[in-house]
């Protein structure tokens, strides 16, 4: 009797395991940044359900510090918030085994101001707020160099820091802040310009195309990506999510949500 009961329990566990596996194949947990990017991901979620029967569970984050850690430790199946230079730096810094498995959008970084309309109006000693994470900090410095506001060491690559500045003719004060804080400092009387990723613009009502003082050009290497663990890159639910994200429905929604500030990176 005990043997029979044990066999029945084992069979039940095996069946439960099979059911769970089947359920997971049609379920994916994806990390996104709260706000506009999550709004876009909601459209991908709808497409995934309609086209593939895939249930997408979106997990919102307020900043860029936690999604990769959660993905690396299996708390998320994938995330959608970063570009390749950011991923490379995070993998190197934390020993993550994360890989890019698909492109999403290029979100141009640009300089915004409530005080000036052009670079020519920027006064000596002005304060410019930039992101403080290594890759977007470097991206902002390269943008400032492109506007001839600073000069950087030759061959500095994509990850310059303030220590790589070799010339600062206007003696600009460069303030490093968490990316999510940058839209709020536009109203700070001490800040003249904030360099902000399109990701964090929704709350401001600003358009990178129409409202920026200066902006990255179309050749930016910073296309955003879908990221997962190396051992999960061939999972069917990941492939179906990518196909759902890279859809006309998502591209159209992003065009509206980001007011023209999201360029599809898969076309």
PLM feature spans:
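Beta->alpha turn/N-cap motifs
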Residues: 35, 62-64, 74, 78-88, ...
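C-terminal motif of bacterial Sec signal peptides marking the signal peptidase cleavage site
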Residues: 14-17
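Pocket-flanking alpha-helical
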Residues: 64-95, 110-112, 117, 140, ...
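Periplasmic-binding protein-like
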Residues: 102-113, 138-145, 202-267
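A conserved helix-loop-strand patch within extracytoplasmic ligand-binding domains
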Residues: 101-151, 251
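Short, polar/charged alpha-helical segment
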Residues: 27, 34-59, 66, 70-72
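Short helix-initiation/N-cap motifs at beta->coil->alpha
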Residues: 58-69, 156-184
């Amino acid at each position: 009797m005990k043997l029979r009961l044990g066999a029945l329990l084992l069979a039940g566990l095996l069946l439960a395991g099979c059911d769970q596996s089947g359920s997971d194949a049609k379920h994916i947990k994806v990390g996104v940044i709260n706000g506009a990017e999550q709004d876009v991901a909601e459209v991908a979620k709808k497409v995934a359900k309609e086209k593939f029967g895939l249930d997408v569970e979106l997990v919102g984050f307020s900043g860029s510090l936690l999604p990769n850690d959660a993905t690396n430790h299996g708390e998320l199946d994938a995330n959608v918030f970063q570009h390749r230079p950011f991923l490379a730096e995070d993998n190197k810094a934390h020993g993550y085994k994360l890989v890019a498995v698909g492109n999403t959008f290029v979100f141009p970084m640009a300089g915004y101001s409530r005080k000036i309309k052009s670079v020519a109006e920027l006064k000596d000693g002005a304060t410019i707020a930039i992101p403080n994470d290594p890759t977007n900090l470097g991206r902002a410095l390269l943008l400032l160099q492109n506007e001839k506001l600073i000069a950087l060491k030759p061959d500095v690559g994509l990850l310059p820091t303030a220590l790589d500045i070799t010339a600062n003719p206007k003696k600009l004060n460069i303030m490093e802040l968490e990316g999510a804080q940058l839209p709020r400092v536009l109203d700070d009387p001490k800040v003249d310009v904030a360099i902000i990723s399109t990701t964090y613009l929704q709350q401001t009502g600003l358009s990178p195309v129409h409202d920026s003082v200066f902006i990255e050009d179309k050749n930016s290497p910073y296309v955003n990506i879908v990221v997962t663990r190396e051992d999960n890159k061939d999972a069917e639910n990941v492939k179906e999510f990518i196909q759902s994200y890279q859809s006309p429905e998502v591209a159209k929604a992003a065009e509206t949500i980001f007011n023209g500030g999201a360029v599809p990176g898969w076309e």
